[in-house]
Amino acid sequence: EKLWTPAEARETLADLFPAVDVLFAAERDARTVLGFDGDAEAMASGLAAEFDFETVVITRGEKGALARHGGTTTEQGTFPADTVDPLGSGDAFASGFLAERLDGASIDEALAYGAATAALKRTIEGDMARVSADEVRAIVEDGGGVDIER
């Protein structure tokens, strides 16, 4: 709302959507900016159907994320972490997800790597996730059984 109204944002974004394969949206933005109601699964399904996205990922903060891909919805919880600064966690999630998908991972695996990258980011001051692939992999392989501390 600082730069434009939700209606203006939706109109501008809708013009760009034909070039989008993978859409990431925070649950609140899918509701307020894109105008989709219901739970995250309904939003993801609706967005995928209306705009013909290959994949829609809805992030839900502490409730994790879900992805709609190929007519299937997959959910991922969060990994526990001592939060120092949440700023940039959504971007970190997207980067972890995309890195894995580009490397040939399944949607399930990509969601886990996105969640692990976001968890690691929350342990870092500032808005940039300065983490390694090995750190992310260790969180995923551990299954989130250990609180992440730095």
Model-predicted segments: where are they?
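Conserved beta-alpha-beta core of the PfkB/ribokinase-like small-molecule kinase fold
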Residues: 1-46, 63-64
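Conserved phosphate-binding/catalytic region of the ribokinase-like
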Residues: 36-150
